[in-house]
Amino acid sequence: MSHSWDGLGEIASVAQLTGLDAVKLIGLIVKAANTAWMHKKNCRQFAQHLKLIGNLLEQLKISEMKKYPETREPLEGLEDALRRSYLLVNSCRDRSYLYLLAMGWNIVYQFRKHQDEIDRFLKIIPLITLVDNARIRERFEYIDRDQREYTLDEEDRHVQDVILKQESTREAASVLKKTLSCSYPNLRFCEALKTENEKLQIELQRSQEHYDVAQCEVIQRLIGVTQAAAAVEPDSEKELTKKASKKSERSSSMKTEYSYDEDSPKKSSTRAASRSTSNVSSGHDLLSRRASQAQHHEEWHTDLLACCSEPSLCFKTFFFPCGTLAKIATAASNRHISSAEACNELMAYSLILSCCCYTCCVRRKLRKTLNITGGFIDDFLSHVMCCCCALVQELREVEIRGAYGTEKTKISPPSSQFMEH
């Protein structure tokens, strides 16, 4: 399985790299390492190690050194090793993601092998006798001490274990969808699977040309994984389509009910009174429906320190906090609370120095009503640090969500009537 990685020169055109000296080749490797999307850590470590060598070689006249036979052959060997290293790093960007994932440990072995080979050629070159100064010797010692460790990342190892299982499961499809969305951000999942399948077919053809049976089996297994994931994807799309159709039907039925209510005339004052009470009950139903539909906790729509974005609300809350607190408490408790009641509560708790405790309890009730993430300590610290900012954030959240709670029922008297004699 490993000898196909030894023949990486067949994958890219080596002729394009001929004529480049060691310093330029190192520059190409560093540039390719920055754009690699597989084995990123190994590529960057390898590039950092080669930078040390490149900084040393920049001070030498390589063209002059090639005139001497004792330095020409080691330099040419070093350049050949750097060309193979460039092909290795460049393959971490251009080759199939699944293939690179399956061949992970072989690639790690190649990084170690290339680093040892380059260091071996570097020691053969008699640089110390040509450039005899202490700074060069110190850099040689630093290069000897710089031994990088190449391994497979934990996340890539987990994905490799899931994909290379004997049975194709939905777990493999979900993991594959997550990883391919990162590797192909501009493509849909089906298009990314198609691209990977095409690349895997090319890898399979190359392995068959090398008569590598073990690697062919791995690639065929990866092709099966992509086909299984492609079969799972239409089922999930059908489920999403069904859910969307149900939502559209529900919304259309609500619209028809609303239009019917608008068209129906108001016949009597008693019907208007019953409609006002029904609005109160519908407010209860709306809040309970919102609470039941929330499957997961949500976040605050506004930041705690973003109160200055609405200066008028900030000034109103600073000079008249009771009005703001009354609206928040109404939405939190689902019961109409007037500004006077909120003011009485604030005054009562202020006498025992527990004003912040009362307001943080209101914030906690509001979080539970709107299903927002957080804890009691977060609520307490928010009101201790800046109670005004916390109240502004809570009222803005109520306005954004439209959760005004139960408003006080207003009963209007019937219109005046005249009796004819």
Swiss-Prot record:
Residues 233-288 are annotated as: Disordered. The keyword Cell membrane applies. GO terms for cellular component: plasma membrane. It is a single-pass membrane protein. The keyword DNA-binding does not apply. Residues 270-282 have a biased composition (Low complexity). Disruption phenotype: No visible phenotype when grown under normal conditions; due to partial redundancy with MCA2. The roots are unable to sense a change in the hardness of the growth medium. Mca1 and mca2 double mutant shows a strong growth defect. The chain crosses the membrane at residues 346-362. It is found in: Cell membrane. Expressed in roots, leaves, stems, flowers and siliques. Expressed in vascular tissues of cotyledons, leaves and primary root, in the promeristem and adjacent elongation zone of the primary root and in the shoot apical meristem. Detected in the stele and endodermis, but not in the cortex, epidermis or root cap, including the columella. Not expressed in root hairs or in mesophyll cells of leaves and cotyledons. Inhibited by GdCl(3), but not by verapamil. GO terms for molecular function: calcium channel activity. Residues 188-218 form a coiled coil. One of its GO terms (biological process) is carbohydrate homeostasis. It comes from the Eukaryota. Keywords: Cell membrane, Coiled coil, Membrane, Transmembrane, Transmembrane helix. PANTHER family: PROTEIN MID1-COMPLEMENTING ACTIVITY 1 (PTHR46604:SF3). NCBIfam families: A_thal_Cys_rich (TIGR01571). This is Protein MID1-COMPLEMENTING ACTIVITY 1. It comes from Arabidopsis thaliana. The lineage of its organism: Eukaryota, Viridiplantae, Streptophyta, Embryophyta, Tracheophyta. The gene is MCA1.
